[in-house]
């Protein structure tokens, strides 16, 4: 009787051991799932436009340097850009554009760092004096003259100067004036030109004198050589 009792006593012990083993299996599986989730946390995903639509793309490593565009940066047309004055934090971004020409709209020189950047990377920095006849008492940040606008646009309508960036202190009014006159050459209506100009002027809004200058600008003063003009301009002129 004693041995039988022992046999009956062993049964629940085996069942208990089997139960513990069964419980331990899902715990290991849960740990594996946690490890997989931890691995996913090490990855970086970005949303990217593809031929099949917007997809989530895995990036193995974060960028090693900061890529920061200049203030009010925006593409205008293919290889033509606009912005405020670039600072050193923007230089890695500008290098990716492979710029050949930067047009600076001011009577004053840009920052020394921008001068050094252009010299180091062989970028043609073109000074477009907004008022060549200005005296010492004149405001160097006044609006552009018709003569200076024409000179800038002659550079813009010549493909050999591309990729090209047009910039001023804040990338608002003087840059907006040049781009607005370019849009007139391209055949844009005044409502669309004004809307684009005001998009960059911020909470203060646009300047009525700038819009009047753009409206009154004689587009025939800009001479376009179709053999040297950018393809997007030729398309607009068709």
Curated annotation (Swiss-Prot):
Record: active site: 168
Organism lineage: Eukaryota, Fungi, Dikarya, Ascomycota, Saccharomycotina
Keyword Nucleus: no
Keywords per UniProt: Acetylation, Cytoplasm, Hydrolase, Phosphoprotein, Protein phosphatase, Stress response
A Pfam family assignment: Y_phosphatase2
GO cellular component: cytoplasm
Chief location bin: cytoplasm
Gene that encodes it: OCA1
InterPro entries: Prot-tyrosine_phosphatase-like, Siw14-like, TYR_PHOSPHATASE_DUAL_dom
Protein family per UniProt: Belongs to the protein-tyrosine phosphatase family.
Top-level EC class as recorded in UniProt: hydrolase
Protein name as it appears in the record: Putative tyrosine-protein phosphatase OCA1
Region (Disordered), start-end ranges: 1-43
N-acetylthreonine: residues carrying this PTM: 2
Source organism of this protein record: Saccharomyces cerevisiae (strain ATCC 204508 / S288c)
């Amino acid at each position: 009787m004693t041995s039988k009792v022992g046999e009956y006593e062993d049964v629940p012990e085996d069942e208990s051991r089997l139960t513990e083993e069964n419980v331990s299996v899902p715990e290991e599986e849960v740990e594996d799932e946690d490890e997989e989730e931890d691995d996913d946390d090490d990855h970086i995903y970005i949303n990217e436009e593809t031929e099949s639509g917007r997809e989530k793309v895995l990036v193995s490593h974060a960028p090693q340097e900061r890529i920061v565009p200049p203030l009010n940066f925006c593409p205008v047309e293919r290889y033509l850009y606009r912005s405020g004055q670039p600072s050193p934090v923007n230089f890695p971004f500008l290098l990716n554009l492979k710029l050949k020409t930067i047009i600076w709209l001011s009577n004053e020189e840009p920052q020394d760092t921008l001068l050094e950047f252009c010299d180091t990377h062989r970028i043609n920095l073109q000074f477009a004096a907004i008022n060549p006849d200005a005296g010492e008492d004149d405001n160097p940040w006044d609006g552009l003259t018709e003569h200076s606008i024409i000179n800038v646009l002659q550079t813009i309508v010549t493909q050999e100067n591309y990729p090209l960036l047009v910039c001023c202190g804040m990338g608002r009014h003087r840059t907006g004036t040049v781009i607005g006159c370019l849009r007139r050459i391209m055949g844009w209506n005044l409502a669309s030109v004004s809307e684009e100009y005001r998009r960059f002027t911020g909470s203060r809004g646009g300047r009525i004198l700038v819009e009047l200058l753009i409206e009154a600008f004689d587009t025939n003063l800009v001479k376009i050589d179709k053999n040297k003009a950018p393809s997007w301009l030729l398309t607009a002129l068709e």
